[in-house]
Amino acid sequence: MEIGFIGLGNMGLPMAKNLLSAGHRLIVFNRMKEKAAGFQDASVQIAESPGEVASMAKIVLTMLADDNALRSVVYERGLSQAPSFLETLPQGGVHVSMSTVSVSLAKELAAVHALRGQAFVSAPVFGRPDAAATKNLGVVVAGEGTLIETLRPVFEALGHTTFVVGQEPYLANLFKIGGNFLIMGAIEALSEAFALVKKNGGDPEAFLKVVNAALFHSPLYENYGGMVLHERFEPSGFRLELGLKDVKLALEASEGARVPLPLGGLVKDRFLMALAFGLGQKDWSALGLLPLIEAGIKKP
């Protein structure tokens, strides 16, 4: 299958390599061209713009940092005023957005693509860069059913499970935002519990073992608990500053649906505090330092 791929960052690059390993032909674009230049393979073409990718491939995957980056790729013509991605994707072409973006943007893109006879599928992923490299992502997909079946080999080249959650693309983004909201809450709760145990003379590592064995046997608690305990915040799998973006996505969706998220407001403030301490470029699990600082266990 010939696939366009836009966005070769910490997640996008290993994902693109896995598509290549699965035998797909790629047309790639990245704003920082040196990332794309790393592909030395006859099955890869390097495009000069998102519009060029869309003109050469009927299926295009985007893996970008946020709403602004995705809007820029879809709508903007760039300095050369070459046709945009939206203008050059052919009728019947498919845009698969794998980014964590807002529910409102997913709805908008579904509408604008439909007006041009194009299809839009949302397929954000659960997993960090190491999971992307080992094809161990969970792919959450929403879109038209027969189209998803056509795309299934693409998703299977990227992850261990494809979760189809509905026909409306925004539903996949809603599930991803909700899942990330749970991760944020877990990091905060774990870290507060670690501070409680440590300040009272207990061993947080032993506590985590008990929690994983007796209460919440979960990769989430095991992985993030270990990262917080051992302060494995670099290299960053997901920057803390992007965590603030994700909690804002949850709050935006909740406001639009009139759903109170009191924990969301708290977590947003925790991210702001972490940014004030200069932790923005560290992994978002560095949020777990705050309870230790506040308890006087660590210095700011």
Predicted features and spans:
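NAD(P)+-binding Rossmann beta1-loop-alpha1 motif at the extreme N-terminus of oxidoreductases
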Residues: 1-63, 93, 129, 161
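Hydrophobic residues within alpha-helices
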Residues: 15-16, 35, 109, 154, ...
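Hydrophobic beta-strand scaffold residues
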Residues: 26, 46, 120-121, 162, ...
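Rossmann-like NAD(P)(H) cofactor-binding subdomain of soluble oxidoreductases
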Residues: 50-55, 59, 64-68, 72-137
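Rossmann-fold dinucleotide-binding core
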Residues: 100-184
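Helical "substrate-binding/catalytic lid" subdomain
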Residues: 171-295
